[in-house]
Amino acid sequence: MDYRVEPPRRKVIPNWRYYNNTVNLGELTSYENVNLSDTDLYPIDDYITDWIDSKSVYRASDLISAAITNSQKNNSHVIEAAKFLLSKQDKINLVQQQTAEYILANHNNMQCDKDVLRLKNVAIEKLKSANETHNKIHALRIYAHAYPFNPIVYVDMARAYVTIGLKEKAEKLIRMALYLDPKNRFVARAAARFYIHIGDNERAADIVRKTGFSRFDPWLMASDISIAMMRGKRSGNIKKGQQMIFSSSYTPFSISELASALGTVEMEYGTRKKSRDLFNQSLVAPNDNSLAQAEWAMISARIPITIQSGLDVKCSHESKVYKSLELQDARESIHHAIDWICDMPFSLKPVLVGYEISTSLLRDYDLSSNILGVGLKSHPNDPWMLNNRAYVNARNNNLKEAEKDMERLEHCNKELSESMSVCKEATHGLIAYRHKDREMGRKMYEQAILHASSMKENSEEVKIKAQINMLREELIFSNYQNSSALMELEQLVIPTEKIELVNLRNEVFDEMKKK
């Protein structure tokens, strides 16, 4: 079996994690050569007063979170609060411990939040049920009531709502956070990521630009350059960014995403040497985003990047997926894909990659269905996911669930593309075959093949896929005794570069050998 899975096209857009996780990854630290005035900082005086009045775990955590965002971690009250938290080991959680350690500069050995390091299918089941997300929303509502002017709470709540597909509620919260603190790096990058998520790249670009810091802050500059690429434009910050990454005024970690974004620009221009050098610069002290971009560039464009062995990058699930696939280890890659999904449950990309691995490489249709279940939480009426979950459920003879998804697909109120309409017909054919209705199954598949032949794009690929699926069902229906179907399948001309189609046909041959 060929274990290649083509990674989706990638840009260095900002990841969006909950605030405490972002803090623990070091992405909100201040950087040299930029001195923000007191008027640019979100005031923490109220938090200090609350801490002095009531020295509790709750007050200490709140003060520390506000201090980190606003580059005030050296405040004596903040340091006192951090020490207080670490003295209450029996009353604090992992995130609170890590945040306090960060304040006291004991963060060198911090690990990614263990809550996202889940290797079992049970993790996917938890995300499908969304109980934890609803609990998170409930806790954040209480927090917002206590601190109605803290933008961080609204950003975190927006992320929780996006994870369960409530984009309108999420947008209201994002707008509130931007109103309270539009210059805040965490708020701006999270808001930009939200608008990219809902397809409004123009708004994302506007948010980053209006911070006023995208010409000085390397994290915001990286976002500006990448979002411009997504819009088919060239950022005005490229020249400034090139000067910045070779300046001694910035730490290697703070310019990692910037160097990666510039490397991607040069890669698209075809200047491979410049691209290689910039990617190598991004790997001096990478975060998970820049490391994944380098892995992607090596696979998709064969850029000869040097990735040091033994790099310990927190939450680098995506890059580990690509690395495992390069090593032809599908089982290891699905473990990392599940971690990635748990880390970014609102994002389609990890869901699509995880689905492809579990379906094409592992042929684990239960897992494929569960992965799509997570994707359908954040994208509840996505036609592709509804159809494909119906497909894998039908392949697994779970016909009731397959029919439920096809019913949802009929009423999803979204205009289907040509290829999606063909796939829907083919899936109806598969379900009919599994109901032992060969006549209807063959009729639906033949209609799908006919319609695929007249498609403007990807006609041959969609047609061949429908043919393979129909011939497989013919063979299964005949208990693999249909010699004409077998001969037709063997003689089917499949381009060697169409790995998914090659694997799909080989799967039929493998099943025949077991009979």
Task: Describe the residue ranges of each PLM region.
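Alpha-solenoid helical repeat scaffolds
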Residues: 61-62, 79-80, 96-97, 121-122, ...
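Residue-level recognition of tetratricopeptide repeat
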Residues: 65, 83, 125, 159, ...
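Short coil turns that delineate tetratricopeptide repeat
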Residues: 72, 90, 148, 182, ...
